Regions:
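Surface-exposed, glycine- and small/polar-enriched segments that build interaction surfaces at terminal
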Residues: 1-142
Length: 142
């Protein structure tokens, strides 16, 4: 921490390889053998009186001669209970506009290739139930 200036910096990086695959970084919560596993909570701190709070970026690196990596966000399988949710939300504001969620597929400048697709699909069901819903709504003005 710092009383003046910039606080500390943490750089977590796996090893590199000149001829093979670079190292991996795994962050895992603790196992709960008789109960729940632990949480992983990733967040920035609040800002001071005249600044913004920090940003979180999750991205793969650029690939110059092959495909770049994927970013996957998901919940785990549940054998007997309800599977976990994936929620994406942005903040509200008391004096300014609310945050924006933008979902867009990748484009290409190559004439012989198509742009990426964006797909929204509900979950399938067992033979005696219906599949999940897809709901879009617009909030009312206050």
């Amino acid at each position: 921490s710092s009383h003046e200036g910039v606080g500390g910096f943490l750089h977590l990086m796996a090893g590199e390889s000149a001829t093979g695959t670079g190292g991996s970084v795994v962050i895992s919560s603790g196992l709960g053998k008789a109960s729940s596993s632990g949480y992983i909570y990733l967040r920035t701190s609040e800002s001071g009186t005249s600044g913004r709070s920090g940003a979180i970026t999750v991205a793969t690196g650029t690939a110059t001669e092959s495909s770049s990596g994927s970013v996957k966000i998901g919940s785990g399988l549940s054998n007997k209970g309800i599977a976990g949710q994936v929620e994406v939300s942005v903040g509200s504001s008391t004096l300014g506009p609310g945050g924006i969620i933008a979902i867009s597929a990748g484009g290409t400048s190559y004439d012989g290739a198509s742009g990426g697709s964006a797909t929204v699909s509900s979950g399938r069901s067992g033979s005696s139930s219906t599949s999940g819903n897809i709901m879009l709504s617009v909030s009312l003005q206050f």
